[in-house]
Structures are given as C-alpha cells and as structure tokens.
C-alpha cells in the first residue's frame, strides 16, 4: 500500500485578493448584461482605503463603476474602517481604457465560428472521482470551510467574525484514495474583544465540525485555529489585494497543472477563462462517464487562430480506454474553438461574480435571472455529455 499526503488551501470572499476578483467580475457582469459582445479585461487593486480599477474594455455600454465597486465591498462585509475597509467611504480610481485595435483585428471575424483566440496560451481541465463534485478532496473541503466562515459571520451564528479568512486541509491518501484528514488550518479575522480560547472552541464547533465529515477526522487529526493568536487587522489594511492572485485556489488546489492565466475580469473571448472552463467540462464528463478515475486535459491556442494548437489527455493510469482514443472522442464531441466554447457553455451572461469566491469549479449548476436574462450559471459543471462519451468509447 502506498501512502502520501496532499494539501490545498482556500481563502474567504473577504480576502484582499478575492475582493479584487469579485470587483473585476462584477464589472464584467455589469457590462456583459448590457452588451453581450463587449470585450472586457478588468484588473483591480485594493489597499488601505482605496480601490483602483484598471484594464481594457471595448463597449458602448455605460456602467456606474463607483457605485458597483462600493456595493461589492459592502456586500462582502467591509462597512467600517474598524473592520479594515469601508465600501461607503473608500477612494475609487478608474483607470480603464480601450482595448487595442491590434488585438481586436486578430480576434474578431465576420463569421463568428472563425473567431480567433484572444491570446496564445495553455489551459488545463481536471476531474477526479474522489468527491461527489468530482473535485480533489483537499480543495473541496478547504472551500467549504471558508464558505461556512462567511455564512456563520453573516447569519449571526458567530457575529464577532470579520470578513478575512484562510483555510488549509491536508489529506492522507492510501493507494491514491483520500482516507483521512491529517491537518486542518483555519485563520479568521475577528473582533478585538473575543478571547482566543472562545474563538477556538466556537470555530471548532460551528465551522470545522459543521463542515468536515466525522469519518474523515481521527484522534490524530491536528488543528491549527488562528495559530498566530490575534487576527484583528485584516482585509486590504493587512495586505494589498490584486485580481488573479489566487489561481490555484480558483482551480484544483495544486492537484492539477495550471497554464498560468487568471480568470476574473475576463470576458469569454479570453481563452484563459473560457478554455479552462471547457477543460473542466471535458474532464468532468470523461470521469462521470466512467472512462477514467482521474483526468487532466491540456488545450493550447495561438492568438487569432480558432482551432486549438493541441489537445492532450492524461488519465494517470486510470483510464478504461487509451488516451489517444479519448482525444479523438473529445474532438468529435466538443467544439473547443473560442466561439464553439462560448456557444456550448452559453457563456455570454452576467454570471461571473458568482465564480469569484470559493472556486470556479466543483459548484452546482443553477438557474439565474438578471433582468430579463435567464440562464444557467456554472454550466461547465454539467455532466450531460457523459452518456455520449460512454457510447463513443463502446462501454
């Protein structure tokens, strides 16, 4: 029997980098709600008392960027300088400019199916059958811990919590299957009047034991709750936040490879985002079809070129058919050109702020309505291709 450990981390919606991601995606949503064919690349920086919004946009839509930014910050829970940031009073700087026409000429086409990739690059998708969501267990439970932290804070279960938090979970694997949790780390911002011993017991009861299955916890499981002691100063006062700084948290927690491109603030013409979503869709359907226990797909592109420059698949020795045959089946059943991805996953809707905290993958698809627009968020998490893939594989 082989035995190893694997660790993943997550951060809360109040982490400075996640504030930036949520603002960038809120800007994207506001624009795409009015102009589905806008080109958006929005970058945000937050630091003590200020939010700087920059990037490139091509659209005729008007967005009240200041109001939008203030609402995002306040909704997260930053409503007072005592907490470390105040959405109502912080300074907001708008540095957004026009997209370069040289990029547009390489991407835009009269025939939309020939739309070129917005940049070169390589993207990965991954799935594993070790959790019901087909996500790696260490990341899945890390996300659930900080998601529960926000829920306990906002619902009043633990009203002395503040928005900034981080989690980390180490799993023990035996023969590549997760069997137990070795270590749990949870650091959460809090009001100054809560005692450390009270915080530890409340977090243990209302967050950790609320989220982590008892069968995965043992007498040897180690817990580090606010291991440095006080965590009163947090958010953008404690650290500068930037869009795109949590790409491993956003994806697979280090269990799969990453091409390096961030997601938030980018419209679907940017393959950094859309092709990574498509990669997850492909890998998840392969695993859901029973064609592999684990699957990682790499897709690559050249700027201005529609067809992927390469597609490769690794099933880590768990596949029921050859990887070469899997690539053939994927080419037959998935259109991985930029326009094809956008159409296949129905991406031209204002759904992206929903993705900007607690992971872009492993979430349940659900119906959203924004104005007159009704659509499915997290469409890349559907397993509607699994039966077709199984039949194509002859299983």
UniProtKB/Swiss-Prot annotation:
The residues listed in the UniProt record as binding L-methionine, with positions renumbered to this chain, are 56, 99, 239, 270
Task: Pull one GO CC term from this UniProt entry.
Answer: cytoplasm
GO biological process: any one?
one-carbon metabolic process
Task: Kindly state what the record says about how the cofactor is bound.
Answer: Binds 2 divalent ions per subunit. Binds 1 potassium ion per subunit.
Q: Recorded E.C. number(s)?
A: 2.5.1.6
Cellular location(s): Cytoplasm
Residue sites binding Mg(2+) per the record: 17
Q: Annotated region Flexible loop: where? A: 99-109
Q: Which family does it belong to?
A: Belongs to the AdoMet synthase family.
The protein, known as: S-adenosylmethionine synthase
| UniProt source species | Colwellia psychrerythraea (strain 34H / ATCC BAA-681) (Vibrio psychroerythus)
